[in-house]
Amino acid sequence: MNVNDSQWVARALEQRGFVEKPLEEADVVFINTCSVREKPEQKVYSALGRVHQANPRAVVGVAGCVAQQIGAELMRRHPQVRFVGGADGIAPAPDAFVRLLHEPKLRLSYLDFTDSFPDRDPYLLDAAGQPAQEGVTPVAYVNIMQGCDNFCAYCIVPFTRGPRKSRSTQSVLDECRHWVARGAGDITLLGQNVNVFGKDKYGDGTSFPELLRQVAAIPGLRRIRFVSAHPRDFSQETIDMFAELPQLMPRLHLPLQSGSDSML
């Protein structure tokens, strides 16, 4: 999911006129973080040290789960950091970088969880409002929800990604069609717990199994996958989709840290 977020930010920056450059030549540096890896905070601070050594004049932004945890402390410890964004700070990041380049003293933080899914569809359009002419891609990843309400003892996700929020069905389908039109025959639907898609207050009445049906109906789409699926919320109807939809690959990704009750 973080990789997908980072790729989206890169595309959105390119659509605003940015060009990818080596670290030493960059005007802005975007660091997206993950808090479920070993020693995540130390790795972020190490990365910031390397950036400062290589390019002390660059505008640096830090986003993702570690940014959500540490917050404004990142700016205090590293003055070069001028943007901090949590899970809901990804969407405003591209426009924030444009502002930061034009306002040298400005610092921005987006650490509050928004009251709706932070949709990014407008960034798939060019300046004329037409679909952006991105390159052909055989595989695509589409966010359908984010956050989690399960609060498992071993998991930090509810604190770093916030409460669960479903994206609108139409928005999901529009992005899937966008990628299929650009050559994607294989789409993975992303979320911290895709099984509860549509069941929160942001849902529009479409369940996850029904969403799978609608995505599978898109002409040209050959394979569908999804991650992650919490076993507590896995319904029989979702299981039945593996038999009903030939496009749905026989693959499950479950957020299991251990099979031992005593260990958990």
Regions found by a protein language model. Name each.
Residues 1-198, 242, 248, 252:
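Proteins enriched for Cys/Gly/acidic motifs involved in redox and nucleic-acid/cofactor modification
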Residues 60-64, 69, 181-264:
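Conserved SAM/AdoMet-binding glycine-rich loop
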